Amino acid sequence: MSDGVRRAGQKAVCGLVNLVFPDECRVCNEPLREVSRIPVCSRCLKEPEPLQAEFFCVTCRAPFVSRYPLDETGRCALCRLGLNGFDAVYSFGTYDGTLRKLIHLFKFQGVRPLQKVFGGFLAQVLPREQRFDAIVPMPLHWRRRWQRGFNQSDLLAREIARRWGVPVRRVARRLRSTPPQAGLTSAQRRKNVQGAFQAKARLDGMRILLVDDVLTTGATAGACARALKRAGAAHVSLLALARRDRRDRWLNVEDEAWPRTA
């Protein structure tokens, strides 16, 4: 074997090792001191914390800085008007900082072993006394799934199912690809996803846990939840890994259906 071929082989092996076992944390860029299938240091994996706020909607668990948007029963305007579509929401953290970077590694860079870490996060916020008959992952349109190679919500659903002993049922179907939701109001988002989902089987009387990775306004998840209810589901809860923090954003009254001030 010539020296050139040997050097090329060594370079290829080193490149493969660095790819599989990178020497820097992909979140903080600090040197990795342990060999792991997850290219993230233990400190960054432990950094995300459950969402905290002074006030929450009792139904969708949206965080607020004051009681102003909540009625006497503790519900926000969207839940009071039945615009969310689901019966309860459980979410782990805020979609920013380290948690956002971890989700990007999982979702866009294919670091699938993170699903076990995320399963631990979700287990912290899902009440053990709740009973579910099936866990349903939020479906991707087939083109998006083909491009990404996997459905991140499906991986999260499988991890929760493994921990809870509840079956995964892939009964939600995305009928059409929807335009990007970024920059749209909640009302526009709801219109954007109207009729985008369908249930593939009857769910009469079932309590469903719908699993998604990130909750923004809830328009997409709400549309899917309504499709499951049209198929007979008695109760649909949403479990999300992260939600965008909207506490300091006072929303447009007409678009968001918040109560007007006197």
Q: Where in this protein do the model-derived segments appear?
A:
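Glycine-rich phosphate/pyrophosphate-handling loop used in enzymes and phosphotransfer proteins
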Residues: 1-212, 216-262
